[in-house]
Amino acid sequence: MPNAPEVNSVWDELLWRGLVCVSTDQGALKELLDGPPIRFYCGFDPTAPSLHVGNLAQILIMRRLQLAGHRPIALVGGSTGLIGDPRPGGERQLHSHEQVQEWVRALQQQLSRFLDFKGAAAAVLVNNLDWTKSLTALDFLRELGKHFRVNAMLKKDAVAARLSSTEGISYTEFSYQILQSLDFRQLYLDYKCVLQIGGSDQWGNITSGVDLIRKTEGAGVHAFGSPLLTASDGSKFGKTEGNAIWLDADLTSPWSFYQFFLNSDDADIPRLLRVFTFFTRSEIEDLNRSVRENASARLAHRHLAYSVTRLVHGADVADQVLLACSVLFGDGGALGKTQTGLPRIDSDTLNDSSGVTTIKAQDNTYTPYSPEGVRFAGTFPVDPRFLRSILFELPNATVSAHDLITHILQKVGLCRSLSEARRLISQGGIYVNNIKVTCPDALLDSFLDNSMPIRAAILRKGKKHLAAVFY
């Protein structure tokens, strides 16, 4: 079956990638986006010190539009962040002015990494506090409030959900949609911005801005919303064990970030490739085919995880994550192909000296995408400090070097019982420092290199379950 043709229209590209679920007139939007460059915007409220992967989906829509020649405005809500967008779960906690403005600066710095601020399609960063800090209560009521009808405001999904709850909604959060509408109008006046994008959960606020511009300026502007990302099991995408997956490496390490995408459910892969990568349509279809025909190889998962990690944390860090996977998992699987000569985890691997462990790849090319896998050429250094930092992120325990491997497996949670540990060892599914454990009565010290600068060992169950022990 031949690959489908690539998409030439940016609007059709957005539709194919599943990035539009609600919009103003689609015919007008297609004409707008497939025509001369326009200004468009997306807003991000500073509710935390970092953006997360849900925000990344919106940022990448901005980048796709910028690559098509359109000029993005990234708005960080220094004023709306002080108020809080109503959410079904209840009233948001109000943060101090100082805290919110600190988060504004952090989010602006993050956004600056993903957009191009030079050239004909140069992006602009704005803070809505700049035009709301001098707005008086009387001006708010006279110049803005009179254009909003309470009946219409009550019908917005977020407001309606809160009104049906026992807690209700405060006037503070009820007014949020007016402030967001003001943002769109201000950007229309200052930059001739004619398009707002955002998540579908913001659609009520977005259309309020469209209506405000029509009423006050007599102009027609446009908007579209993208679907909220959920995992195949219905859970909110971007959460793991209740914690958000942040773009800040200090909040979610590059290793954990990579593992989050690597461990995506097979059913989620086609959509995640469309949303989070810049792979072409034919490349994505090749990867989807690999999931159907050889799911155990997890080729598409590896491409997804590597590509997004590289995008967020840079090529050098993404390469270190990939090489660390090759060392820790022992068989080169992180590269999508089995390699020979991968090192035993020993004193050199975790040494803190100027020397580094190296992996000699067997392939002669490297590209971020290839049908066979993410590939490296030549000899690549593995930063031992990076490897050491990963040990403390893994499930871990302090043990004695004279403990039985079976007892350790149970202690670190790789096995639920001693009988399970013995069974897995007899089946050849347990490794210590990349050495297969063959005897159920083996002790930890028979696998150790005591010259290591950190007294640690890495246990692996099967292909992907790791734990660290310190002795």
Swiss-Prot record:
Domain S4 RNA-binding span(s) in chain numbering: 403-471
UniProt catalytic activity: tRNA(Tyr) + L-tyrosine + ATP = L-tyrosyl-tRNA(Tyr) + AMP + diphosphate + H(+)
Motif placement: 'HIGH' region: 46-55
Assigned keywords, A-Z: Aminoacyl-tRNA synthetase, ATP-binding, Cytoplasm, Ligase, Nucleotide-binding, Protein biosynthesis, RNA-binding
Binding, L-tyrosine: 41, 176, 180
Disulfide bond entries: none
Principal location listed in the UniProt entry: cytoplasm
Broadest EC class assigned to this enzyme: ligase
Motif ('KMSKS' region): 236-240
Annotated positions binding ATP: 239
E.C. numbers: 6.1.1.1
SUPFAM superfamilies named among the record's database cross-references: Alpha-L RNA-binding motif, Nucleotidylyl transferase
GO BP, one annotated term: tyrosyl-tRNA aminoacylation
One Gene Ontology term of the molecular function aspect: tyrosine-tRNA ligase activity
Function (record text): Catalyzes the attachment of tyrosine to tRNA(Tyr) in a two-step reaction: tyrosine is first activated by ATP to form Tyr-AMP and then transferred to the acceptor end of tRNA(Tyr).
Family of the protein in this entry: Belongs to the class-I aminoacyl-tRNA synthetase family. TyrS type 1 subfamily.
Protein's recorded name: Tyrosine--tRNA ligase
Lineage: Bacteria, Bacillati, Actinomycetota, Actinomycetes, Micrococcales
